[in-house]
Amino acid sequence: MQCFSFIKTMMILFNLLIFLCGAALLAVGIWVSIDGASFLKIFGPLSSSAMQFVNVGYFLIAAGVVVFALGFLGCYGAKTESKCALMTFFFILLLIFIAEVAAAVVALVYTTMAEHFLTLLVVPAIKKDYGSQEDFTQVWNTTMKGLKCCGFTNYTDFEDSPYLKENHAFPPFCCNDNITNTANDTCTKQKAEDQKVEGCFNQLLYDIRTNAVTVGGVAAGIGGLELAAMIVSMYLYCNLQ
């Protein structure tokens, strides 16, 4: 009985933490959606890399709602000893765990396919909005400066972009010796072609692979917590009268 009470208390505390994390994600998501520029000024390249591939604001809001609801469900189920709530909590967490494993496998096995898919989404956006949409341009500038890269694939992503049409040059990040913007020389097509600055997608993959141990450790830690939460919820479910 003491063991059951201890596990029940730990379940409540753990899910209270999850509940608060969900609320924080929701708040940050709303912040990014309303004022992405100030978010970038604070977090810089740490946040901007992912903003090329997904709408981070909406993504964080969606993730926050799920985590918020999951934390509430876990707290409610443990506190009221509701078998229905505990089983619902278990199955939602199981689905999330399976989705994460599937996403990891797809990312590892189908990297080339993912790159092609993202290229179809991101490159047209660069050609359309870089140089005309302030927030979009700032996100890319922060990313290219932080990762020392150029475009999604390379400098050709900026062809026909508003920036190129207005400045008759490519972004300085596409020319290694002009990144600091101290030189008078503009980043011409010939210069960008000669410099061969890596695209941000490949650079991001390189950074992830370089820090594979850290990334893997974080992923394993999250997976371990999810498994532990599922085991505890099932233990409580099975020991309730």
Swiss-Prot record:
Gene3D superfamilies: Tetraspanin. GO terms for cellular component: cell junction; lysosomal membrane; nucleoplasm; perinuclear region of cytoplasm; plasma membrane; vesicle. SUPFAM superfamilies: Tetraspanin. Residues 1-11, 77-88, 238-241 are cytoplasmic. Its main location: membrane. One of its GO terms (biological process) is protein stabilization. CDD domains: uroplakin_I_like_LEL. Glycans are attached at N141, N154, N178, N184. PROSITE patterns: TM4_1 (PS00421). Belongs to the tetraspanin (TM4SF) family. This is Tetraspanin-1. It comes from Pongo abelii (Sumatran orangutan).
